[in-house]
Amino acid sequence: MPLLTTEELSQMSPLFRGRGGQWLAGKLMQLVRVDELNALYDRNAMHRGADFATAVLDDRQIDYLLGNAEMLDKLPQGPFITISNHPCGHIDGIMLIEIFARIRPGFKVMVNKILGRVKAMEDNFITVIPTGRKRDVPQKESLLGVKAAISQVRSGEPVGFFPSGAVSDLSLRDRCVRDREWQEALIKLIRKLHVPIIPVRFFDGNSRLYYLLGLLFGSGIRLLRLPAEVLDKREKPLRLGIGPVIDLEAQDACTDLESYAKMLRDSVYGMPLPETFLSRGELLGR
């Protein structure tokens, strides 16, 4: 079952309807390499969860290096939360699931509706539609996602969040690639859940072209580049690190939401590049 079909594109826009529209839809899917993503999915759809994540990474020869891997031996026994920056997009969630769901099979990551189409990983996904603005009314699917996250934690299972709700972009002001402001609604949810938090930082990102497209044309055009970014990550290993657990005492020391949000973001972006890493092969062989 493909992730996206030309028929579904025709439902999104009249531009892709009729014989000519379907031809155009097919060409667009080739241009942005959605057809390659469909083929990647079909080759590995017999796997589920963490096994699917592993199969996809193996298929594309995508490697990563995990810093502070010893923290995986100190994971809380009950529910916990992971928080992460989001520099690469879909591949960030896939790596998180391979790492954490192999230890805690019930681990789920809150993802957007696009990644939520990957049915082979639906057991490890909570699907939402990020609003991105404080005053936007959450859609029904997002409200269901919030309820699912609460239920996940109350049942004693871990859940992962990308608090930005969007892939990182290039900030000319800060002269670096960074997440936009983390969503207030998610910060409130994390605080309400009141369980240990594990920061995870991804130290690498997408291509220069990806960020340039975002600067010149906005997030819509940049989104079309994401399939290629997923498919072209084999050149060098991606680096990520796990930080110290943020316990309940540290969380309770924050007297307001602003200081709480700052503590969470600082726990990720303040994480230094680890001095030593464990290769993906070594991690899976543990």
Describe each model-derived feature in a short phrase:
Residues 101, 106-142, 146-147:
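Conserved nucleotide-cofactor-binding alpha/beta core module
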Residues 91, 95-98, 185-188:
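Short amphipathic alpha-helical face segments that pack within enzyme cores
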Residues 86-90, 167-168:
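Gly/Ser/Thr-rich loops at beta-strand to alpha-helix junctions
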Residues 2-6, 142-286:
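Non-catalytic C-terminal accessory region of glycerolipid acyltransferases
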Residues 98-101, 177-179:
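Glycine-rich, phosphate-binding/catalytic loops in enzymes
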Residues 81-83, 126-127, 160-162:
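Structural motif
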Residues 1-83, 93-95, 102-106, 122-123, ...:
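Membrane-anchoring hydrophobic helices of lipid-metabolizing enzymes
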Residues 46, 62-63, 138-143, 179-180:
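A conditional alpha-helix N-cap/helix-loop micro-motif detector
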